[in-house]
């Protein structure tokens, strides 16, 4: 999308350059000099400084105090007239500086130095200015069209880039948030299910073991019950161990796969960012070099006419230099690509090696654990067999009776039946629970899939709507520019160029030498500044790169130290656990060996108790070790996630710094203006075409190589993963087969042993029947003792289990609380980052708005000064011509010329009004589009940071529309009253002398500018003036309601040197046709239009508030009787004395305007506060909804606090809404009052 927009902008720019290529052939100097000063492009310093950009744009175009414009009119010939003019200039300059200081603050030393250099250049170019004024009008038209088109392209590119970056950032944030949430949910569900399964399994096993132990100790003898119990424990522990190993292997495999996938995606994203940044930087470097080269060719065109050979040699050298630079940049980029490829290969090798070492270490650990487990099983089996043989031998020696044999057989049959039914009941309960949980799991997956699909569809629809809206706006802007601006500019240029072609040929010889010297000086200054700017930019790049490398190195060093410390602690802990376990085993074995040497009959119970305690200790140690391993794995995962989050945050900050730097570089590079010449058009097209073909081919090659490398990496990774999976599955299969074979062999061996033992027991039981009566009492006593010991141990074991459950519940609650706190902290950080980014964006837009305002103001002021100078020269020429014509005398011709002059002046006024109206429509359209994009984009209110009370934007049209729309009232359409204007000085000359009509027609063909308020005439106390002549002494009738006091004091704001488009009126003759308008015509008025102009301001405010929607009545005198205090643009040539004026009405109107401004600012701040409160309430509601989905026991207090805050915010929203509703009617009155003031001014 971005490449398409860039190509479209370049094509439109080429079309624009083709249209104006004839105008730029011999007017090179008019692009760089204006009023004797060098017109330098706006630097990044002026764009970034919001306080002093507009003030210096105004000061740069002010005339110097040492060179006053010499008006040779009737009033400036005497000493009194010169003193009066000097006093007017001093007072205007004083008020200008006061206004600049109040609006923009104090001036910085760097800006003062810049202003001092400009003043020096003005003094140097004073003599040259007098000869160069003829080219100004053509320069103005060219620059206006060029600037309009360039600002339009800049705005379009800036908005496109901004929306693209915002969309990319939102998509990236959403993807990251979704991935993190999905991973957390999966891990949480797996962890919860595993904990539930382990707890349930443990409780079941404990209940089963306790029941069986109690039953067997009551019924069977000690040795038989012990052997059966240990056999069941071995089987259960083996099954649990196998299931735990399988679950651990699966979890490790899933975790390794997810980590590898995240690293792969992260590397690919970083690589794409680096490649795009390098391409963008190279593109701008090449564009800057080509623009500088074109400007150099344009500057050297005039000098090349005298010395063509030297110019060709210079072009050859410049081409070689830029070709070498381009070749070096290309080689540097190739080396950078090679370096990136090497780094990527090394990274892939390191990742594969790390994965292989981890896998190898894991396999070794598994093998060691299996070997240890087999050794423990063999030792346990041997000990069990030994004890079983000894118990059978004692049983054979002591059992002789047939009744005991029958009772034992009956009891054994009951135990087997009970065990079988217990197993069946347990399996049925487990199957039932699994069936109940299966639909819930399927429903959860279906809900997640449907929600994700709906969200994707909504995002896609929003993206398509935004794209269509952008395309529509771009098409409208292109059509408007092609239909209106280009034909008007081309027609005006073609008409004026024919008239001035002859004068250009005559003046070119005189200005050639001076122009060459000035070109040399300007080129040397430009070269020095460019070199210094390049050095500064390289220093900034080196500093940024050094800071990024230092930060990465520190983070890597800290992570490496922490990982080494954790690894060392884990190794020490494992060694300590192994040593402790080995010591426990050794002690138990010693105790058993020592106790076996005593009497067998007396110590059999103690030996069995010690062995049972040893088995319990081993089982407890084994369970504790497994839980410790699980907790360490969880802690390791958390630490790895924290490290990854820290790395992402560091990279995000580096990316933000790089983006800001790129923005600054782009803002600097945008200010360089490209000028195309007719001589090198074919050569430049060929070079651009070849460069474009080469770059497209290289881009295609880079894309293909990148796709091939990514495909190769993916295939290698997939192959390695498949092989690893196959190897793991084969090993697991072999291990399962071995376990099954061992289990079957053990079953067969146990059956044979049981059969032999039972046969021997059957034989020996006959012999032991006689000893039953003797041993019956001893057996009963021994059973009682064993029962008491079993009950005591069961109680202690039950207490331990309860304690473990409580600890586990507390750990889960603490983990959930920590997770909720971390999520809430991350959400607050993201919210603060978004608000800071929005504030920075609004601040940048305000900076750009003030810079644009300064440029428009500077251009308008220069145009006004030039028009005054031209009028003075025309006045002098007309006076000289009048002296010649008075000697000849022709009264009849003068009368005939007077009648002809009236009709021509009427036509001239109509053309002038049409030209001014088209100019105002173009400027108003640009201002409206800019204000809608900056202040009212999509109807969304801006944040509070965008309200700057100390700034005043002079584009009043969109602001009034926005305030009226916010207050609930429609836009008020106003019409300009047409009033007749006097003939003026030029009209009187044309009425007396018919030969001056041609000069008068050429003079009046130009458009009249507007006068800023700091060039207005001061009050009556400073300079008394005489009443005007030639029919201007008619009394002005009183006007009703709002317009009468304003028009009564109109000379305070509209003085002879402030020509407004609304002041043009129609003389007796054909009426001016009204201009068609589709909406309210909002003019771009200067600051002088809002100066106080009436004495009855409070009365007008009250009347306006009473009737806010009524249009102010327009007096009929404005359309019939000329205003004695308004002057025409032709009266600018002579400074005539006017009637005396008072400042009381000005002060009242100023107070009224300040009050209106305060009301509007208060309404805007209230609206912004309401928007921020609504946003805060929505965020609090969303947090409550998320918290209610997963409630916790400790979150109730936090939820109550958030609920109270939400209620307070809703109350505040209600109060602000009521306040806005109450303020709508006063705001509508203020809007109507401003419309009435503007209508009266027009």
From Swiss-Prot:
Regarding protein family, the annotation reads:
Belongs to the SFI1 family.
Assembly and oligomerization: Interacts with CETN2 (via C-terminus).
Please list where the region (Interaction with CETN2) is annotated: 111-130, 475-494, 641-660
The principal location of this protein is cytoplasm
Tell me which InterPro entries the record gives: CACF_protein
Which molecular-function annotations from GO does this UniProt entry contain? phosphatase binding
Record's comment describing the protein's domains: CETN2-binding regions contains a conserved Trp residue in their C-terminal ends, which seems critical for interaction with CETN2.
Sections of the chain in a coiled coil = none
Residue spans of the HAT repeats: 138-170, 172-201, 270-302, 334-368, 399-431, 1148-1180
Q: Which GO terms describe its cellular component?
A: centriole; cytosol
Disulfide cysteine pairs (residue numbers): none
On whether Hydrolase is a keyword of this UniProt record, the answer is no
What this chain does, per the entry, is described as: Plays a role in the dynamic structure of centrosome-associated contractile fibers via its interaction with CETN2.
Protein name, per record: Protein SFI1 homolog
What UniProt keywords apply to this chain's record, in alphabetical order? Cytoplasm, Cytoskeleton, Repeat
Localization, per the record, is: Cytoplasm, Cytoskeleton, Microtubule organizing center, Centrosome, Centriole
Q: Look up and give the organism this protein is from.
A: Homo sapiens
**Presence of keyword Repeat:** yes
Q: Which gene encodes it?
A: SFI1
Region named Disordered? 1017-1038, 1053-1081, 1101-1122
């Amino acid at each position: 999308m971005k490449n398409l927009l860039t190509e479209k902008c370049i094509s439109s720019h080429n079309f624009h350059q083709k249209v104006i290529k004839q105008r730029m052939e011999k007017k090179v100097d008019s692009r760089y000099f204006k009023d004797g000063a060098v017109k330098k492009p706006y630097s990044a310093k002026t764009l970034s400084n919001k306080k002093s950009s507009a003030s210096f744009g105004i000061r740069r175009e002010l005339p110097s105090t040492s060179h006053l414009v010499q008006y040779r009119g009737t009033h400036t010939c005497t000493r009194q007239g010169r003193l009066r003019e000097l006093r007017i200039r001093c007072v205007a300059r004083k008020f200008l500086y006061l206004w600049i200081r109040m609006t923009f603050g104090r001036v910085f030393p760097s800006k003062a130095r810049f202003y001092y250099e400009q003043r020096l250049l003005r003094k140097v170019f004073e003599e040259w200015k007098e000869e160069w004024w003829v080219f100004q009008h053509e320069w103005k038209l060219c620059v206006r069209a060029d600037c309009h088109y360039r600002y339009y392209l800049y705005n379009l590119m800036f908005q496109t880039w901004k929306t693209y970056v915002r969309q990319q950032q939102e998509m990236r944030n959403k993807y990251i948030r979704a991935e993190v949430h999905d991973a957390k949910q999966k891990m949480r569900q797996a962890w919860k299910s595993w904990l539930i399964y382990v707890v349930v399994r443990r409780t079941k096993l404990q209940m089963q073991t306790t029941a069986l132990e109690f039953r067997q100790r009551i019924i069977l003898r000690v040795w038989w019950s012990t052997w059966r119990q240990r056999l069941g424990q071995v089987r259960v522990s083996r099954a649990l161990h196998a299931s735990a190993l399988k679950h651990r292997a699966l979890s490790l495999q899933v975790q390794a796969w997810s980590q590898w996938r995240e690293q792969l995606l992260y590397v690919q994203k970083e690589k794409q960012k680096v490649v795009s940044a390098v391409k963008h930087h190279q593109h701008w470097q090449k564009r800057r070099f080509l623009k500088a080269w074109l400007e150099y060719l344009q500057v050297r065109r005039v000098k090349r006419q005298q010395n063509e050979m030297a110019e060709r040699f210079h072009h050859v050298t410049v081409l070689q230099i830029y070709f070498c630079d381009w070749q070096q940049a290309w080689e540097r980029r190739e080396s950078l690509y090679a370096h990136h490829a090497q780094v990527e290969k090394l990274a892939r090798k390191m990742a594969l090696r790390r994965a292989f070492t981890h896998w190898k270490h894991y396999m070794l650990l598994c093998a060691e654990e299996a070997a240890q487990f087999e050794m423990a099983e063999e030792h346990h089996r041997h000990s069990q067999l030994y004890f079983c043989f000894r118990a059978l031998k004692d049983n054979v020696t002591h059992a002789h009776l047939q009744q005991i044999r029958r009772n034992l057989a009956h009891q054994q049959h009951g135990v087997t039946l009970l065990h079988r039914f217990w197993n069946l009941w347990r399996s049925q309960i487990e199957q039932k629970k699994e069936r109940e949980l299966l639909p819930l799991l399927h429903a959860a997956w279906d809900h997640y899939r449907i929600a994700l699909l709906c969200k994707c569809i909504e995002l896609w629809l929003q993206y398509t709507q935004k794209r269509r809206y952008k395309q529509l706006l771009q098409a409208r802007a292109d059509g408007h520019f092609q239909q209106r601006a280009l034909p008007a500019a081309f027609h005006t240029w073609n008409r004026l160029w024919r008239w001035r072609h002859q004068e250009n040929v005559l003046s070119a010889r005189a200005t050639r030498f001076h122009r060459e010297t000035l070109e040399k000086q300007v080129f040397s200054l430009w070269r020095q500044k460019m070199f210094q700017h390049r050095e500064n930019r390289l220093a900034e790049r080196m500093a940024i790169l050094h800071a990024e490398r230092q930060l990465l190195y520190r983070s890597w060093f800290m992570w490496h130290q922490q990982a080494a410390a954790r690894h060392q602690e884990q190794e020490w802990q494992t060694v300590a656990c192994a040593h402790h376990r080995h010591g426990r085993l050794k002690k138990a074995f010693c105790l058993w060996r020592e106790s076996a040497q005593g009497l067998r009959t007396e110590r059999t119970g103690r030996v069995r108790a010690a062995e049972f305690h040893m088995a319990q200790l081993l089982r407890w140690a084994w369970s504790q070790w497994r839980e410790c391993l699980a907790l360490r794995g969880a802690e390791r995962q958390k630490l790895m996630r924290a490290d990854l989050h820290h790395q992402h945050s560091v990279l995000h900050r580096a990316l933000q710094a790089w983006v800001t730097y790129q923005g600054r570089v782009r803002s600097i590079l945008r200010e360089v203006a490209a000028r195309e010449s007719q001589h090198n058009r074919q050569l430049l097209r060929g070079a651009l075409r070849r460069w474009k073909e080469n770059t497209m081919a290289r881009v295609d090659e880079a894309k293909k190589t990148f796709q091939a490398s990514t495909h190769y990496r993916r295939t290698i990774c997939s192959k390695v993963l498949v092989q690893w999976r196959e190897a793991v599955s084969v090993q697991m299969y072999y291990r399962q087969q071995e376990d099954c074979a061992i289990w079957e062999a053990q079953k067969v061996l146990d059956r044979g042993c049981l059969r032999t033992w039972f046969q021997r027991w059957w034989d020996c039981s006959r012999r032991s029947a006689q000893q039953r009566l003797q041993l019956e009492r001893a057996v009963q006593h021994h059973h009682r003792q064993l029962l008491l010991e079993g009950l005591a141990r069961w109680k202690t074991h039950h207490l331990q289990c309860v304690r473990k459950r409580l600890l586990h519940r507390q750990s889960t609650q603490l983990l959930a609380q920590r997770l909720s706190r971390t999520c809430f902290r991350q959400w607050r950080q993201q919210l603060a980052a978004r608000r800071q980014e929005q504030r920075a964006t609004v601040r940048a837009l305000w900076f750009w708005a003030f810079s644009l305002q300064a440029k428009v103001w500077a251009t308008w002021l220069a145009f006004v000064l030039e028009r005054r100078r031209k009028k003075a020269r025309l006045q002098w020429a007309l006076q000289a011509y009048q002296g010649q014509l008075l000697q000849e005398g022709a009264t009849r011709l003068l009368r005939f010329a007077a009648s002809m002059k009236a009709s021509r002046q009427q036509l001239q006024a109509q053309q002038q009004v049409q030209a001014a109206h088209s100019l105002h429509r173009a400027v108003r359209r640009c201002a409206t589009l800019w204000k809608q994009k900056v202040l009212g984009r999509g109807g969304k209110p801006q944040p509070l940071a965008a309200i700057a009370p100390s700034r005043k934007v002079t584009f009043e049209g969109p602001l009034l529309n926005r305030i009226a729309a916010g207050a609930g009232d429609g836009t008020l359409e106003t019409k300009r009253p047409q009033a007749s204007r006097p003939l003026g000085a030029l009209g009187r000359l044309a009425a007396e002398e018919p030969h001056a009509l041609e000069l008068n027609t050429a003079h009046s063909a130009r458009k009249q500018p507007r006068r800023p308020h700091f060039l207005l005439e001061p009050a009556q106390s400073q300079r008394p003036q005489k009443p005007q002549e030639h029919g201007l002494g008619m009394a002005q009738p009183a006007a009703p309601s709002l317009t009468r006091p304003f028009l009564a004091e109109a000379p305070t704001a509209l003085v002879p040197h402030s020509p407004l488009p609304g002041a043009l009126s129609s003389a007796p003759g054909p009426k001016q046709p009204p201009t068609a308008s589709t909406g309210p015509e909002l003019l771009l008025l200067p600051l002088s239009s809002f100066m106080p102009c009436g004495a009855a301001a409070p009365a007008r405010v009250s009347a306006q508030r009473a009737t806010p929607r009524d249009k102010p009545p327009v007096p009929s005198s404005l359309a019939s009787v000329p205003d004695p205090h308004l002057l025409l643009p032709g009266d600018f040539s002579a400074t005539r004395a006017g009637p005396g004026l008072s400042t009381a009405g000005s002060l009242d109107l100023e107070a009224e305007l300040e009050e209106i401004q305060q009301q509007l600012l208060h309404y805007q701040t209230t609206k912004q506060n309401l928007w921020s409160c609504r946003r805060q309430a929505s965020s609090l509601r969303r947090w409550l909804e998320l918290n209610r989905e997963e409630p916790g026991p400790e979150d109730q207090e936090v939820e109550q606090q958030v609920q109270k805050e939400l209620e307070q915010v809703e109350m505040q929203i209600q109060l602000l809404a009521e306040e806005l509703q109450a303020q709508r009617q006063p705001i509508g009155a203020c809007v109507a009052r401003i419309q009435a003031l503007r209508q009266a001014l027009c």
